[in-house]
Amino acid sequence: MSKINIRNEKKSDSTCISEVITLAFKDDPHGDGREAEIVELMREDSALTISLVAEVDNKIVGHIAFSKVTVNDEFIDWYGLAPVSITPSYQSQGLGSRLIEEGLKLLQQLNAKGCVLLGEPDYYQRFGFAADEKLILPAVPAEYFQALSFGGSTPGGIVKYHPAFG
């Protein structure tokens, strides 16, 4: 594979990002077809704390977003990772891992206390994520809702993402 460039998104990237997200989730049995719309709504609301793209040969082929979450309706410096998207022809080549690692590093530089996500435990455990019974995302199987604390204790309570998630 050619050189990979990970960078912050630019305003001019939004159409390409939407295309990448749509392609990435097109055949995903857990996707609902709204992933690109969710990112766009968060962008319009200035709610994307971190939004990174992965480029190969100056073409955007991956994207990741991080946004604030609340625990028991209070923002306590925890963030949600959602979504991470890689164009299908570039999947399974380490781009998702690179985006996740870079995003988590940037969150820590922002003095975040932790990050949550909804995803496959077998994939995300390599980054340190694990289910934690103290954090609850209603109507979701507990083993798929995972947390990563950046050093402190994990809070307890009901987690809410940005309203764009529905």
Where are these regions (language model features)?
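A short beta-loop-alpha structural element at the N-terminal edge
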Residues: 4-17
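Active-site rim helix/loop that mediates acceptor-substrate recognition in acyltransferases
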Residues: 18, 25-56, 61-65
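Short coil/loop residues immediately preceding or within conserved phosphate-binding loops
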Residues: 49, 76, 112
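A short acidic/small-residue loop/turn micro-motif
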Residues: 68-70
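Conserved acetyl-CoA binding element of GNAT-fold acetyltransferases
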Residues: 75-88
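Conserved acetyl-CoA-binding loop-helix of GNAT-fold acetyltransferases
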Residues: 86, 92-105, 117
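Conserved active-site alpha-helix within GNAT-family acetyltransferase domains
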Residues: 109-113, 118-142
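C-terminal "cap" of GNAT-fold acetyltransferases
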Residues: 116, 137-166
